[in-house]
Amino acid sequence: MASMISAEKRNPAIVILDFGSQYSELIARRIRETEVYSLVMSYTTSADKLRSLKPKGIILSGGPGSVYEEGAPYCDPEIFNLGIPVLGVCYGMQLMVHELGGSVKPATGKAEYGKAPLEVDDPTALLTNVISGSTMWMSHGDSVQKLPKGFVRLAHTSNTLEAAIALHDKSFYGVQFHPEVVHSTHGMVVIRNFVYDICSCEPDWTTNLFIDEAVSQVQQQVGDKKVLLALSGGVDSSTLAFLLNKAIGPQLTCMFIDQGFMRKGEPEFLMSFFDEKFKINVEYINARERFISQLKGVTDPEQKRKIIGREFIRVFEEESLRLGPFDYLAQGTLYPDVIESSGTNIDPKTGERIAVKIKSHHNVGGLPKDLQFKLVEPLRRLFKDEVRKVGKSLGLPDEIVRRHPFPGPGLAIRILGEVTHEKLNCLRDADLIVREEINNAGLYNKIWQAFAVLLPVYSVGVMGDQRTYAWPIVVRCVSSEDGMTADWSRLPYAVLEKISNRIVNEVEGVNRVVLDITSKPPGTIEWE
């Protein structure tokens, strides 16, 4: 990785023009995995803007449109006169063909979706070291009917004659498949060929370089002013705390609001870690009773979220006034927050998609609009996996770097129905057992999330020849790459048995354990 400053001051080596593809962000991530800096920008970005950025390559993303339909998204045609290598992916390839004099029509046979063997006709340039017959991921209903003058075929599939094409003398390339998705077995080979062999990029997107430049940028931006950070204990805010502490030290104040819905031992661990071990200035705000009292009698999940969000804002306002004044508010905004999926928020100056709101603090609601802070967002050009690498390099322990995603409202939305002290204690104990056994089995880092849910019903059971009526606990473990989709994790029966036995024997008030085997979609990862 390079740095957030690279994003702000250094030009990207590769620009991805986004035509509405669900994979545009993934293309950027894959390029960064090759240690080359990339940015996603709107397809409306002008050729003049791109010329000023001086990228070494341009990628035209896929998209849901058809180039021959009215209203289809088109890029500035002058892009093809910049003398910069271009790679069109799926819709991007069709657009390039259409713009340069070829033709695109609905697929004559049938649309091609899913895995397809790629037959390589010309194993040079873009397809160097791509094995003929390797699997590539297809997702298109249109196909190229006629190539523009000078273009040649590089590969085909059984349903797509022009699966990869090239205009070698201008370094224009197109692929009908998606090299960025994990199902394309040689997709990264294609991406590396374009980035290094065709665009002649240098590997300069490294973690250490990011840290050095980000520290310098924060120091320049902040000067001798004071910065406030709302610390949740998640990987984003924790990494940001370490980075800012390295940059400005005592000018940073972290506010940790304990709303009473964290997992067992977490508040104590976070305070001992940040405040005592690393001497980062953390103000601990114990608001447990305040939050739970507001939830008395509340069973609707949306109401719970709104109440927790409202109270967080009130506590944040009160405490920032007490601890301040502060000049800057630090936020753990990440690049996916900047890349708005709707594509409607376009910066007219840069052509980039932009976030238009202050990021909600760990999903519990936006911060007050009238807080007069300037923003410090040094992570805003990083993806989640890049943040983990930065955190690791800064010295964050695996307990935080590899911490599973945790909802802002915490255990309050893993207790269905009303939240009480008794239910919280019960769920904390059960949740700890789930995580302990997953960790003992060496599975923690292989699973996206693993947690327990408490149901607001009584289940009949028998313990010691006595009939019992107690709560059931749901075990929820899912595998995912980004949380957008997820599948339930196939845990070994022995691990499930240990989890079940320990919960019913060690957790008071529970007599049954069930396993949630619902994928997302149709379900969500959380129950509320």
From Swiss-Prot:
Single GO cellular component term: cytosol
SUPFAM superfamilies: Adenine nucleotide alpha hydrolases-like (SSF52402), Class I glutamine amidotransferase-like (SSF52317), GMP synthetase C-terminal dimerisation domain (SSF54810)
Pfam (any one): GMP_synt_C
Record-annotated Glutamine amidotransferase type-1 domain positions: 13-204
Keywords carried by this UniProt record: ATP-binding, Glutamine amidotransferase, GMP biosynthesis, Ligase, Nucleotide-binding, Purine biosynthesis
UniProt domain GMPS ATP-PPase: residue ranges: 205-403
Catalyzed chemical reaction(s): XMP + L-glutamine + ATP + H2O = GMP + L-glutamate + AMP + diphosphate + 2 H(+)
Residues at the active site: 90, 178, 180
Keyword Repressor: no
InterPro entries, per the entry: Class_I_gatase-like, GATASE, GMP_synth_C, GMP_synth_GATase, GMP_synthase, GMPS_ATP_PPase_dom, NAD/GMP_synthase, Rossmann-like_a/b/a_fold
Record-listed ATP binding positions: 232-238
Protein's UniProt keywords contain Calcium: no
Annotated metabolic or biological route of this protein: Purine metabolism; GMP biosynthesis; GMP from XMP (L-Gln route): step 1/1
Lineage top rank: taxon: Bacteria
The protein's Enzyme Commission number: 6.3.5.2
GO molecular function, one term: ATP binding
NCBIfam families, sorted: guaA_Cterm, guaA_Nterm, PRK00074.1
Self-association and partners: Homodimer.
Reported function: Catalyzes the synthesis of GMP from XMP.
Protein name: GMP synthase [glutamine-hydrolyzing]
Organism: Prochlorococcus marinus (strain NATL1A)
Gene name in the database record: guaA
